[in-house]
Amino acid sequence: MCIRDSAVTDVLKKCILTRGIKVDDLPTFDIEYLFLNIRAKSIGEDIKLTVTCPDDGETKVPVTIYVDEIKVIRPKEHNIDIVLDDKMSLRMKYPSLNQFIESNFDTEDEAETIVDKTFRVVADCMDTIFDGEDAWEAKDYSAQERLDFVQQLNSQQYKKVEKFFSTMPKLSHTIEVVNPNTKEKGSVVLEGLADFFA
């Protein structure tokens, strides 16, 4: 979801009446799914788009997608529990919309690199640290202590953490198209809220 303004969250905050639900704390895939379904109830269950045929990368064709067919896809290999070594593991939580915006758009600290921001997101998404039989809530540690923990991970351990993020659930829908010029069939995958409003 590549939006800086609060239009989506403003709509959700006005529509979600359940006490205790903080829209800013919801994972981005939940926000996208909720917004898409609110949009469906508001202006219609179908979305008309123009997509590019994958066989030639040029021909554009109109398609209609029905919102109730769009799902949040959770890959089978995705797991919130990450085994770091024989004794230590992490339980992760999904980044909230606020964390997503801060890591992708926050420019307050110009000196902070992409790597720094990535480490900060990982540190913020740690929920529980397990060491043998002991468990610690990450929130009981300072932001700097969590960041130090992330920075001391070796490359193999960090790849496991990266897998958590790369396989996170996401709004996704695959449509089949036929190129009217070549008659070739192809699949187009739409992912994330922006693809459904292109």
Where are these predicted regions, by residue range?
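Generalized protein targeting/export and membrane-interface segments
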Residues: 74-75, 83-118
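Structured interface patches
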Residues: 6-21, 79
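Long, charge-rich alpha-helical interaction segments
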Residues: 114-152
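Alpha-helix initiation and N-capping motif
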Residues: 5-9, 28-31, 97, 115, ...
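Charged interaction scaffolds used for protein-protein
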Residues: 20-89, 136-198
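Short, hydrophobic/amphipathic alpha-helical patches that form generic packing surfaces
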Residues: 10-17, 32-40, 120-128
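Short, small-residue-biased leader/transition segments that mark boundaries at the very start
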Residues: 1-3
